[in-house]
């Protein structure tokens, strides 16, 4: 370790971890041969608290309770309290069922796979990923749009099991307790209300192919992936205890639900509902299996997904929280990038609301926040390594609206009114 400071109290002291001087931090704590600043202490405490919370959930005998699962989900996903409760209960019951499967019971507990329904960018994928991290089981994601029936060009459904096996480092026992998330499940809906006359290998055909592995079967998986060959050796993976979570935006499903609710009323006395009166997420909460069938999912496939969790639209306040509060919040990520150049980054409150409003107008949910931030900071990040004497970059509402450039605050102007 290089010497951060000499024994002379008049010399400038530096944090041994981040390298900041005593003038750049609020407190500098001295040890026998090292110094640590208050910012590094705070960062260490955050890491310890996070590790302690995850360890607490994992170390308890049996399975984490739904409340414990929700508490950890709250650190990563903003809002969606109803969906969190549904998922927490379903996951808790699933792994409780596995832990008690060896005991002799007259009642056999069935597996409850989960369907996540919600507008794009509301956190469906993040919820599934975080659940797998909490339970500490192998996790894999698949895109339903790439799947086809066996024998056709495309990805075989059994390749999903192979991906899970790879995530478990080819430990079959661990893979058989894992979680599979299938995204864009609404894109494999049947193309018409009538049963297919011609073969629908990427829609109804994929639903049929998924039935067995979702319910429980012994899948023969080629270790190297790809198509099966008669001379090949296969790994046998039982999918009975693998939890399948399927997610999709189901664009247009709200119209099917609304039409069912309104019935067939016509005439002067009929109530004409304003489509803006109720938000999409609110309407989706009333989804029933018949609505999914009308959308294009076959009854057998719907039956394999008994637990349905619906996600709400994200309003402006929720999007602002997503920008700043989660562990991996976008603002924190960009602040870390700027810190690498020893420059601070500040977003004013009105700037954050401006970013949120843009995302709502684009109808991209939380997923669109990053592209908006990237556009705002592009020129600044291009010049960032060349800045000399700049101590802080401030983004306000005018910058978000494209009417101004970010404010640059220089070190020598820190004492007075900062301007650029």
Curated annotation (Swiss-Prot):
Location of the ClpX-type ZB domain: 3-56
The entry's Zn(2+)-binding residues are 15, 18, 37, 40
Gene3D superfamilies in alphabetical order: 1.10.8.60, ClpX chaperone, C4-type zinc finger domain, P-loop containing nucleotide triphosphate hydrolases
- InterPro entries (alphabetical): AAA+_ATPase (IPR003593), ATP-dep_Clp_protease_ClpX (IPR050052), ATPase_AAA_core (IPR003959), Clp_ATPase_C (IPR019489), Clp_protease_ATP-bd_su_ClpX (IPR004487), ClpX_bact (IPR046425), P-loop_NTPase (IPR027417), Znf_CppX_C4 (IPR010603)
Q: Which is a Gene Ontology cellular component entry for this protein?
A: HslUV protease complex
Any idea which positions bind ATP? 119-126
Q: Which UniProt keywords apply?
A: ATP-binding, Chaperone, Metal-binding, Nucleotide-binding, Zinc
Q: Sorted alphabetically, which CDD domains does this protein's record hold?
A: RecA-like_ClpX
What processes in GO biological process is this protein linked to? cell division; proteolysis involved in protein catabolic process
One Gene Ontology molecular-function label:
unfolded protein binding
Please give the subunit comment from the record. Component of the ClpX-ClpP complex. Forms a hexameric ring that, in the presence of ATP, binds to fourteen ClpP subunits assembled into a disk-like structure with a central cavity, resembling the structure of eukaryotic proteasomes.
Q: Which NCBIfam families match?
A: clpX, PRK05342.1
Q: What does this protein do?
A: ATP-dependent specificity component of the Clp protease. It directs the protease to specific substrates. Can perform chaperone functions in the absence of ClpP.
Protein family:
Belongs to the ClpX chaperone family.
**Name of the protein in its database record:** ATP-dependent Clp protease ATP-binding subunit ClpX
**Species of the source:** Caulobacter sp. (strain K31)
């Amino acid at each position: 370790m290089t010497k951060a400071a000499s024994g002379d109290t008049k010399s400038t002291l530096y944090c041994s971890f981040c390298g900041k001087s005593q003038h750049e931090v609020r407190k500098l704590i001295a040890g026998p041969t090292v110094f640590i600043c208050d910012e590094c202490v705070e960062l260490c405490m955050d890491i310890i608290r996070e590790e302690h919370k995850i360890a607490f959930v994992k170390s308890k005998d049996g399975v984490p309770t739904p409340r414990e699962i929700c508490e950890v989900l709250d650190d990563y996903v903003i809002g969606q309290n109803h969906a969190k409760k549904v998922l927490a209960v379903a996951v808790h019951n699933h792994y409780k069922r596995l832990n008690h499967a060896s005991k002799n019971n007259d009642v056999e507990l069935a597996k409850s796979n989960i369907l996540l329904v919600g507008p794009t960018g509301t956190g469906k994928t993040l919820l599934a990923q975080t659940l797998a991290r909490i339970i500490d089981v192998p996790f894999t994601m698949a895109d339903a749009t790439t799947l086809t029936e066996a024998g056709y060009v495309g990805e075989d459904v059994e390749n999903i099991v192979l991906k899970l096996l790879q995530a478990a480092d080819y430990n079959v026992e661990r893979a058989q307790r894992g979680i599979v998330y299938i995204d864009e499940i609404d894109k494999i809906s049947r193309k018409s209300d009538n049963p297919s006359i011609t073969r629908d290998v990427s829609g109804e055909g994929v639903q049929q192919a998924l039935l067995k592995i979702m319910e429980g079967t012994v899948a023969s998986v080629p270790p190297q992936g790809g198509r099966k060959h008669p001379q090949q050796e296969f790994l046998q993976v039982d999918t009975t205890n693998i939890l399948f979570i399927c997610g999709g935006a189901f664009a247009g499903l709200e119209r099917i639900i609304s039409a069912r609710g309104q019935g067939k009323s016509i005439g002067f006395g009929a109530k004409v509902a304003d489509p803006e009166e109720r938000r999409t997420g609110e309407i989706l909460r009333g989804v029933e299996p018949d609505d999914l069938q009308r959308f294009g999912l076959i009854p057998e496939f719907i039956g394999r997904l008994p637990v349905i969790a619906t996600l709400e639209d994200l309003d402006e306040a929720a999007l602002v929280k997503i920008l700043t509060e989660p562990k991996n919040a976008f603002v924190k990520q960009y602040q870390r990038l700027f810190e690498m150049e020893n420059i601070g980054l500040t977003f004013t409150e009105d700037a954050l609301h401006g970013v949120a409003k843009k995302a709502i107008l684009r109808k991209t949910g939380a997923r669109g926040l990053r592209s908006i931030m990237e556009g705002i900071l592009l020129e600044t990040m291009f010049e960032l390594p060349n800045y000399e004497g700049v101590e802080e970059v401030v983004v306000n509402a005018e910058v978000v609206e494209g009417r101004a450039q970010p404010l640059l605050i220089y070190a020598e102007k820190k004492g007075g009114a900062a301007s650029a």
